[in-house]
Regions:
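Aromatic-rich peripheral "rim/lid" segments of glycoside hydrolase catalytic domains that contact
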Residues: 336-426
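Extracellular glycoside hydrolase catalytic/binding regions
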Residues: 173-176, 180-201, 205-356, 364, ...
C-alpha cells in the first residue's frame, strides 16, 4: 500500500510538471508557449529582494503552502524578485552565504537565529547549510511541481525595500546601481535558472526612476535607457536564449510611451524590434498604482498611451507590435476597496485587452522592511496611512500577517480570482 501511495504521488507530480510548456516565445502582440498556444500571465509578486535576500514569509508558511494558495486562485506565474547584491556576494565574496547567516546579518544575532529556527520548523528542507540561492531553487521547484511558471525580476541592486528617488538604486550609475555588476547579475541569474524547467522570463530592472543626484555619465533620458537596456537584453539573450526579456519604462515604470511608435528617443535613436535578432523574446512591462482613479476611461486611456497600445497591431502608427504585461498593481485588501474604480477597472480592462498581469503582492509581512522587523503589510490603519510615496499602495498584501489565510476573502474571491478567471477563460 505504501509503495502504491508513493507511486501515485510521483505520478501526480510528473503530471503537474508535464503540464508546463516552456520555453515561451513572442509573435507580434502574443506570447506563446512551447506548443504554440497563447499564454497570458496571471499571477502575483513574491518579494525576495529585501535585506535577507530570500523570498518572504518562510518563518510562517511552507513554500508548498504559499504556492498552493496561488495555484488555488488559478494563477499560472510568480514574479519572483531578487537583488543584484545576492549575485555580487556569490561572485565577489567567495560564494553564497547560508540563510542562517543572512538572517543574522539582517536581523541581528538574537532575532536572526529565532527566525531561522521558525523557518526550519515550517520548512524542514531548509538546513543550517542551505544558501539563499538554494531557497530560490526550492521555490522554483515547488512552483514547477504545482504547475506555475517563474518570472524573475531584478527588483533592485542593494537589497532593501524599493523604491524612492533617494535609495541609491534609482538609475544607471546611482550609488548602488553599478551597471557592470547589474548586467553580470542578470547573466548569472538567467544562467542559473536554466535548471528550472518552469523558468520563462526575466524583468531587466524594476521601476527605473529619476535619481535625486544628477549623473552626467548616465543622464536620465530615453537615450540612456535605450543604450543600457538593449545592451543588457543582448547579454541576457546570449546567456539564456530561451528566456523572454521584459523591458520596463521610465518614471517608476509607468511609461513606455515612445516605444510602440518607434519615436525618436534623442539624437535620432529609435527602438525598433527589427534591429534585434531576438525580437521574438522581447516583452514590455508597466506598473500602475493610480488607486485614486475616478474614471475607468481615464485610467485605461492613460495605460493605453503609456504603452499598452503596442498590442494594437492594426494601428499603422504602431511600429513595434509587442505584448505588454502589467507586472505591478495593487489595492487595499479589505472588504470594499476591490469595488472601487481602480480595482474594478483593471479587473475588467486588462482581461479585455488579453494582457498579462502580476499583482502586488502575496506577502502578508516581511522579515524586515525599512528598518522594521516582522513588518505587517497593513501596518497603517487608515487608507491614507497605507499610501506611501508616489501613490504606491503598501497595504496590498493578499495574505494575513502569518501567511495562513487571505487578508480579505472578498478582495480575493470577488476581486483577484475573478480577474484570473476573466484573463484565462480562453
Amino acid at each position: 500500500m505504501k509503495l502504491n501511495i508513493v507511486s501515485s504521488l510521483v505520478l501526480l507530480q510528473s503530471l503537474a510538471c508535464s503540464a508546463l510548456n516552456a520555453p515561451f516565445s513572442v509573435s507580434g502582440r502574443w506570447i506563446h508557449d512551447s506548443k504554440g498556444e497563447v499564454f497570458t500571465y496571471a499571477g502575483a509578486n513574491w518579494p525576495g529582494a529585501g535585506e535577507v535576500m530570500i523570498p518572504e514569509g518562510m518563518q510562517y508558511a511552507s513554500i508548498a503552502s504559499t504556492v498552493s494558495k496561488l495555484k488555488g486562485l488559478g494563477m499560472n506565474v510568480v514574479r519572483l524578485t531578487f537583488p543584484i547584491e545576492l549575485v555580487d556576494d556569490i561572485l565577489d565574496k567567495g560564494g553564497d552565504v547560508t540563510v542562517q547567516k543572512s538572517l543574522i546579518n539582517a536581523l541581528g544575532s538574537t532575532n536572526g537565529t529565532k527566525v531561522f529556527d521558525q523557518i526550519r520548523k515550517v520548512n524542514p528542507q531548509i538546513k543550517s547549510t542551505t544558501t539563499r540561492l538554494q531557497v530560490f531553487d526550492m521555490v522554483a521547484a515547488e512552483c514547477n511541481k504545482q504547475g506555475l511558471y517563474i518570472h524573475l525580476d531584478n527588483h533592485i541592486s542593494k537589497a532593501m525595500w524599493c523604491c524612492s528617488r533617494t535609495d541609491g538604486n534609482t538609475w544607471f550609475g546611482d550609488t548602488y546601481y553599478d551597471v557592470a555588476k547589474w548586467m553580470r547579475g542578470l547573466e548569472y541569474m538567467v544562467s542559473h535558472a536554466k535548471k528550472w524547467p518552469n523558468f520563462v522570463s526575466i524583468g531587466l530592472r524594476n521601476e527605473l526612476r529619476e535619481p535625486s543626484t544628477i549623473n552626467t555619465q548616465y543622464p536620465y533620458n530615453w537615450g540612456t535607457w535605450y543604450t543600457q537596456m538593449t545592451t543588457a537584453a543582448k547579454r541576457v539573450n546570449a546567456a539564456n536564449p530561451n528566456a523572454l526579456i521584459f523591458l520596463s519604462g521610465l518614471n517608476y515604470d509607468t511609461t513606455l510611451a515612445p516605444i510602440p511608435t518607434a519615436s525618436d528617443l534623442g539624437n535620432g535613436v529609435r527602438f525598433r524590434l527589427s534591429d534585434f535578432s531576438f525580437a521574438n523574446k522581447l516583452v514590455l512591462e508597466l506598473h500602475n498604482y493610480e488607486t485614486g482613479a475616478t474614471s475607468c476611461s481615464a485610467l485605461s486611456g492613460a495605460l493605453w498611451n503609456a504603452g499598452f497600445k503596442a498590442q494594437n497591431s492594426s494601428d499603422p502608427s504602431i511600429v513595434n507590435s509587442m505584448p505588454v504585461v502589467l507586472t505591478e498593481f495593487g489595492f487595499l485588501q479589505d472588504s470594499t476597496t476591490w469595488k472601487n474604480v481602480y480595482a474594478s477597472c483593471l479587473r475588467t480592462w486588462i482581461p479585455e485587452q488579453q494582457a498579462g498581469w502580476t499583482t502586488w503582492v502575496i506577502a502578508g509581512s516581511y522579515y524586515i522592511r525599512q528598518g522594521t522587523q516582522d513588518l505587517d503589510e497593513t501596518w497603517g490603519k487608515s487608507h491614507s496611512q497605507c499610501v506611501a510615496m508616489l501613490q504606491r499602495l503598501i497595504c496590498a498584501g493578499m495574505l494575513d500577517h502569518t501567511w495562513s489565510g487571505w487578508r480579505s476573502r472578498n478582495a480575493i474571491e470577488q476581486g483577484l480570482k475573478v480577474m484570473v478567471q476573466s484573463s484565462l477563460k480562453g
